[in-house]
Amino acid sequence: MCDAFVGTWKLVSSENFDDYMKEVGVGFATRKVAGMAKPTLIISLNGGVVTIKSESTFKNTEISFKLGQEFDEITPDDRKVKSIVNLDEGALVQVQNWDGKSTTIKRKLMDDKMVLECVMNGVTATRVYERA
């Protein structure tokens, strides 16, 4: 099922991302720079390992994981988190845990777009990507 996510995706819209980053605890300057970035996501699958590369003027990051297995991640805003990604009703659902806090990033496919819903403490950001 992860095969449907494989490809290159370009951010086309972002809603409420600054409020979400603020809730996560991202500082003002980092929020402003990150909020202006238009990342490209490159998702690949190799032998059951999913890799998500994010490339932007803000920062380039890469995570690789197997579904259902916890892994260490350093986020673009330099948080050290424990992440786990599961497939839930066709969506890739990532949970990041750090310092007693938790956020969920849900990636789902809708109408040839990939929609990211980032949620923390009731604050939701929606970011929409189209195939590049």
From Swiss-Prot:
UniProt record similarity statement: Belongs to the calycin superfamily. Fatty-acid binding protein (FABP) family.
Complex and partners: Monomer. Homodimer. Interacts with PPARG.
Residue numbers covered by motif Nuclear localization signal: 22-32
Residues annotated to bind a fatty acid: 127-129
Entry's free-text remark on domains: Forms a beta-barrel structure that accommodates the hydrophobic ligand in its interior.
Stored PANTHER family: FATTY ACID BINDING PROTEIN
Compartments where found: Cytoplasm; Nucleus
Residues the record lists as Phosphotyrosine modifications: 20
InterPro entries documented for this protein: Calycin, Fatty_acid-bd, ILBP, Lipocln_cytosolic_FA-bd_dom
GO BP, sorted A to Z: brown fat cell differentiation; cellular response to lithium ion; cholesterol homeostasis; cytokine production; fatty acid metabolic process; fatty acid transport; long-chain fatty acid transport; negative regulation of DNA-templated transcription
Residues with N-acetylcysteine modification: 2
Protein name: Fatty acid-binding protein, adipocyte
Any GO MF annotation of the entry: fatty acid binding
GO cellular component: cytoplasm; cytosol; nucleus
Cited function: Lipid transport protein in adipocytes. Binds both long chain fatty acids and retinoic acid. Delivers long-chain fatty acids and retinoic acid to their cognate receptors in the nucleus.
Residues with PTM Phosphoserine: 13
Signal peptide segment: none
Domain of life where this protein originates: Eukaryota
Alphabetical keyword list: Acetylation, Cytoplasm, Lipid-binding, Nucleus, Phosphoprotein, Transport
Keyword Signal assigned: no
Cytoplasm keyword on record: yes
